[in-house]
Amino acid sequence: MRLSRGICIALALAAPFTLAAAPALAAESRPACDRDCLGGFVDRVLQAMMDHAPAHAPLAPDVRHTENGAALKPGEGFWSTATAIAMAGDGLSTLGRNSSAYRLYFADVASGQAAYFGAVTDKGAPGMMMLRLRVIAGKVSEIETVVVLQEATGQGGADGLPDLDPRGFDEPEATLLAGGERWSPTIMAAAAGRYLDSMTTGSSAGVPLGADCVRRDNGIRTTGVPDAKRPDPANPASRSYALGCAAQLDSGFFRGIVRVRWRPLVVDQERGLVMAAAMVDQGTRPEPPKKTARGRRAQAPEPVPTEFTALLGLIIKMSDGKITRVEVIERPAAKDMALGWPG
């Protein structure tokens, strides 16, 4: 079913007010920190990471900081080893020949949250970082990052994850949408959730996927690849990058995934972008229960134990109510590891 657009209702103020009071009301209606303001906080935190100096960022005394689901003090983890971060105004030369200048900024003004998705290097190793901030009263109270480095991903495919190539990312269109083209944050988050949940159901039913949807994993295009081999009907375990986003879900491409634990991070309504994080648990899924002589299905099998967990950071682009782009960074995680945040 096609998602219906929310109806905008104009409310008229019944009580008259003087012209002198109007500027004060207008000032009160403006957010304490708008899109540009939130972007400034992102840049200050990124610069503090580059400086290896948390004191250079406007952090709240009780700021909470996680990296790849683990709680760390500001200054620990990537913060202490970063050698380059693609920021506004940077060129390719700042990250080295084997990286890129890809960077994308997000803002959810209503919730006081900002985010970043871009290329980084850690002691010379190319990588990508997804970052979320929450700003309260002019201070950063939450910092959540997913950092994926080339050396920590697929190891040539040994663990089923593609090797990271930061040069392969293609930035989604990030221009501001006109008011009539925007969808409610609730609808956008729900659409992202349906896509993630469908990785366990093996069905694209109910997922608002556009016909031109493209997915990339660690910079590698994994849908709609023109010269990729088609799935082998004689081999149910075969997987193909030739299929589109919907057909890929329906083909059983993700059949090894038994559980997806996800949470939306930032919904940028003005740009049609959703940032999410997920822990994806994989195992050996048994054959579905067969029908008995009376036509009833046998008892459902026990829950499938996790054999491998991957941490995913996702950027989902929506246009006209459809998902048109899915950019994923992923790395191995401890088995059954939590995301590190509630919700």
Task: Give residue ranges: language-model regions.
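N-terminal secretory signal peptides that target proteins for export/translocation
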Residues: 1-4
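C-terminal and inter-domain tail/linker signature
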Residues: 25-343
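Bacterial N-terminal signal peptides
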Residues: 8-20
